[in-house]
Every structure is written in structure tokens, then in C-alpha cells.
Design a protein with these regions (language model features):
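Membrane-proximal C-terminal cap and juxtamembrane stalk of leucine-rich repeat ectodomains
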Residues: 1-25, 31-37, 323-470
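Leucine-rich repeat
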Residues: 48, 54-57, 69, 77-81, 93, 101-106, 114, 117-118, ...
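Consensus "Asn ladder" position of solenoid repeat domains
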Residues: 45, 66, 90, 114-115, ...
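LRR N-terminal entry segment and analogous cap-like coil->beta motifs
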Residues: 34-75, 79-82, 88
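The feature encodes a structural signal of leucine-rich repeats
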Residues: 47-52, 72-74, 96-98, 120-123, ...
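Solenoidal tandem-repeat scaffolds enriched in leucines and small polar residues
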Residues: 115-238
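Conserved hydrophobic beta-strand positions in leucine-rich repeat
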Residues: 40, 59-63, 82-87, 106-112, ...
Length: 471
């Protein structure tokens, strides 16, 4: 009996917790007992205000997709066990300072997709000292009060993309425990040297799809722990020489979809642990020697979608590039300067799809199919730049009238009245394929018409000759 009695004693607290969870469940919600307490689901319930009471044991409350507009002070009462609170896709326009008081253990707060929530008071998140994740996605925020996040010393992750920020919020500075910051798809125009001060634990920063035109020197100076930096799809045309200096733990750097015209050797000098480098969809025409020399651990380099005609092996020396290289959608000139790349493609199998744009003799071929000839002294010979001429087997178009053709036509008209119809036809046809002298009629003695014709032609020829020069 002892094992049976013991099992009843163990199950009794669970039963009591389930009963308490169901007993205090709001009418429009569903509640269930979970390992950490009580889960309350009020999503899509058509609520226009916060329920007056929640189970005291509530560990998670979901109020997504309702019609909530305002959160008053202590909007949720006192819930000592609450760890997860979600208010996404509502119509929140104002949150009273102190609305989240009474939630001492709250670790995740999701306020995403409240498009009317355009302003937050500096004391909005007061008393949330345990908060680790804050989601402010798509809230139409123009700015964040500088002291707003200072009340959140434990904050690890901030999601604030799809907002209207024009600069990196000053509120981020000094968040010593922040590890992830999502600021993509906004209107941020620059990363200033003071934007990221004090973020010594930051491991992931996303600024993609903003309007960033400038990254100031030293902007990432305090971010030595950064592992993933996304700056793709912005308006960057240039970077400072030591743009990423000190980021020795960086593993992913995405600079794709910008307006960069060159790749400098100083940009990546400190990135010895970099694994993924995206430089695709830029306007790059030149890569400096040694630009990738320290990237010996690189798994993939994306240079596709640029304006590269040549890529020197010196860009990778003295390091040794081991990863995959993506080079498609570039106007490659497949001459001897790319012979090393052709050999590498054959030997490693880690480079593919390098279509040639020139010289003409290999245009349209993939570089892997180009055969480089050798001179007598063993040097590489560039493929020929062919000059094609057009040949058509069809009859040529009617030529432009010349002096001879005009003269022949005039002569035919002069002689036509004195010849039978059949002779005129034959004479006109023959003029196109004979010399001028052969085209003149045979003039016998005493033929007055012929003499008059010659006199006329004597005065006419100089005029026709001058006109022919102009044509």
C-alpha cells in the first residue's frame, strides 16, 4: 500500500494546481496547467479590455489579435509567477507608465504589430528587472527614449525592426548584457561612432534593409564579442579603412545589396574567424591585393552580382582560401588573368558558374571550358578577340545611285525613242553589267542624232563627275 499512498501524495499538488488554474480562468480564455504553472490563452477572443482577473499561478498569458487599445496602471494586477506575456497584433496606442508593475518575474514581453503605438514613456518598463526579451516589432516608433531600456538590466534580446528609426536608438547604449539587437527594415541612415557604446556582450546585430549610407570609424569598437553583423541592402558606397577593426570573433558579415565599388585590403584584416562573407549585389569592379588574405577559415565568399571582369589570385594571398566562391552574374573577361581560377575550379570543385563575357572567341562559355594556348616559350596566350563580319546569301539591296549609273540611265532615256521597244529593253538591262564605253551606241557617218548626243555628253560629263564626288 505504501507505493500507492505515495503516488497519491505526489499527484495531489498537481491536481490542486490544475483546479486553481481552471477556477480563475477568464470567461473568454482557455487555461491549462503546464510544467511551470498555468497557461492562459486569450488570443482571437475579441477582447477590448484586459480581463479583470487571471489565475494567480499564471506563467504565460497570450492576448494576441484582440482589440486592446490602452494599458492602464497595473493592468494585470499581481502575478508573481508570470514569465511570458504576449500582446501582439492589437490596437495599442498608449501604455501607462507602471502598466507592468506586479510582474516581478516577467522574462518575455511581446508588443509586436501594434501600429498605433508610436510613443513609449521612459518609465513604461519600470520594475521589469528580470526581462530578457522585448519585442517592439512594427510599432511605428519614430524614436525610443534614452532611458527607456535603462530599467532593463537583464535584457538580452531586443527586436525592434519594421519601425521608423532614423538612427540607432540611443537607448541601446550601455546595455551591458544585450546579446541580440534586431533593427532591420527601418530608416536608419548611419551607424555613428557612439551608437553602440558599451555593448560588450552583443553577439548579433542586424541593420539590414535600412538606409545606411555611412558607417563611422570605430562604430563597432565596443562590440568585440560580435559574431553576426548584417548590413546588407543599404546604401553604402564606401567604408572606412578600419571599419570592422577589433571584431576578432565575427563569423558572418553581410554587405550584400549595397553600392560598394571596390574591396579594400584593410576591411577584413582583423576577421580571422570569419566564415561567411557576402559582397554580392554591389557594383564592385576591383578587389585589392590581399583583401582576403587573413580569411583562412572562410566557408563561403559571395561576389556574385557585381561588375567584376578580373579577380587576381593576389587578393587571397598569402592566406589560403578553402571555402566556396560564388562568382556568377559578373562580366568576366576570360583571359590569362583568370587561368588560376580555371585551374582552381578544376582542382577544388568549390567554384562553379563563371560565364565569360569576353573575349569574343569565348563569350558565352563557362570559364571551366576555356582552353588557354601556350606560346613557344610556355607563356599563356589570351583567347582571340574576334572581329566578325556579316555575310548574307540573299541578294544585296539596291545600291545608291552613282555617276555611272546615273549616266547610263540618262543615256538610255536619250536613246530610247530611236530604238524599237525590244532593243531598248535589252540595252537597259545590259548597262548594269557592262562598262561605260560599251554602253555607247555605234555611230555611223552622217548620223546627226549621234553627233548631237556626243556634244551633249561632252558638256554633261564634267557636271556628273563633280556630283559623283559628293555622293
Amino acid at each position: 500500500k505504501r507505493p500507492f499512498e505515495g503516488s497519491v501524495v505526489v499527484a495531489w499538488p498537481c491536481t490542486r494546481a490544475t483546479e486553481a488554474c481552471l477556477r480563475a480562468c477568464p470567461a473568454a480564455c482557455t487555461c491549462s496547467s503546464v510544467e511551470q504553472g498555468c497557461s492562459v490563452r486569450c488570443d482571437r477572443a475579441g477582447l477590448l479590455r484586459i480581463p479583470a482577473e487571471f489565475p494567480c499561478e499564471a506563467a504565460s498569458i497570450d492576448l494576441d489579435r484582440n482589440g486592446l487599445r490602452i494599458l492602464g496602471e497595473r493592468a494585470f494586477g499581481t502575478l508573481p509567477s508570470l514569465r511570458h506575456l504576449s500582446l501582439r497584433h492589437n490596437n495599442l496606442s498608449f501604455i501607462t507608465p507602471g502598466a507592468f508593475k506586479g510582474l516581478p518575474l516577467l522574462a518575455e514581453l511581446r508588443l509586436a504589430h501594434n501600429s498605433e503605438l508610436r510613443y513609449l514613456h521612459a518609465r513604461t518598463f519600470a520594475a521589469l528587472g528580470r526581462l530578457r526579451l522585448l519585442d517592439l516589432t512594427a510599432c511605428s516608433l519614430f524614436s525610443v527614449p534614452e532611458r527607456l531600456l535603462a530599467e532593463l538590466p537583464a535584457l538580452r534580446e531586443l527586436a525592434a525592426f519594421d519601425n521608423l528609426f532614423r538612427r540607432v536608438p540611443d537607448a541601446l547604449r550601455g546595455l551591458a548584457n544585450l546579446t541580440h539587437a534586431h533593427l532591420e527594415r527601418g530608416r536608419i541612415e548611419a551607424v555613428a561612432s557612439s551608437s553602440l557604446l558599451g555593448l560588450r556582450c552583443l553577439r548579433s546585430l542586424s541593420l539590414q534593409a535600412n538606409r545606411v549610407r555611412a558607417v563611422h570609424a570605430g562604430a563597432f569598437g565596443d562590440c568585440g564579442a560580435l559574431e553576426h553583423l548584417l548590413l546588407n541592402d543599404n546604401l553604402l558606397a564606401e567604408l572606412p579603412a578600419a571599419a570592422f577593426c577589433g571584431l576578432r570573433h565575427l563569423r558572418t558579415l553581410n554587405l550584400g545589396g549595397n553600392a560598394l565599388g571596390r574591396v579594400a585590403r584593410t576591411w577584413f584584416s582583423d576577421l580571422s574567424e570569419l566564415e561567411l562573407l557576402y559582397l554580392d549585389r554591389n557594383s564592385i569592379t576591383f578587389v585589392e591585393e590581399g583583401a582576403f588574405q587573413n580569411l583562412s577559415g572562410l566557408l563561403a565568399l559571395h561576389l556574385n552580382g557585381n561588375q567584376l571582369m578580373v579577380l587576381s589570385w593576389a587578393a587571397f594571398q598569402p592566406g589560403f582560401f578553402l571555402g566556396r566562391l560564388f562568382l556568377f552574374r559578373n562580366p568576366w573577361r576570360c583571359d590569362c588573368h583568370l587561368e588560376w581560377l580555371r585551374d582552381w575550379m578544376e582542382g577544388s570543385g568549390r567554384v562553379a558558374h563563371v560565364p565569360c563575357a569576353s573575349p569574343a572567341s569565348v563569350a558565352g562559355l563557362d570559364l571551366s571550358h576555356v582552353v588557354f594556348e601556350r606560346s613557344l616559350d610556355g607563356l599563356c596566350v589570351d583567347p582571340e578577340e574576334l572581329h566578325f563580319t556579316t555575310y548574307s546569301p540573299l541578294p544585296s539591296p539596291e545600291p545608291v545611285a552613282t555617276t555611272v549609273s546615273r549616266f547610263s540611265s540618262l543615256l538610255s532615256k536619250l536613246l530610247a525613242p530611236r530604238a524599237p521597244v525590244e532593243e531598248v529593253a535589252n540595252t537597259t538591262w545590259g548597262l548594269a553589267n557592262t562598262k561605260l564605253s560599251d554602253s555607247l551606241p555605234s555611230c555611223g557617218v552622217g548620223v546627226l542624232g549621234c553627233k548631237v548626243t556626243f556634244v551633249f555628253l561632252f558638256f554633261l560629263l564634267p557636271h556628273l563627275g563633280g556630283h559623283g564626288k559628293e555622293t
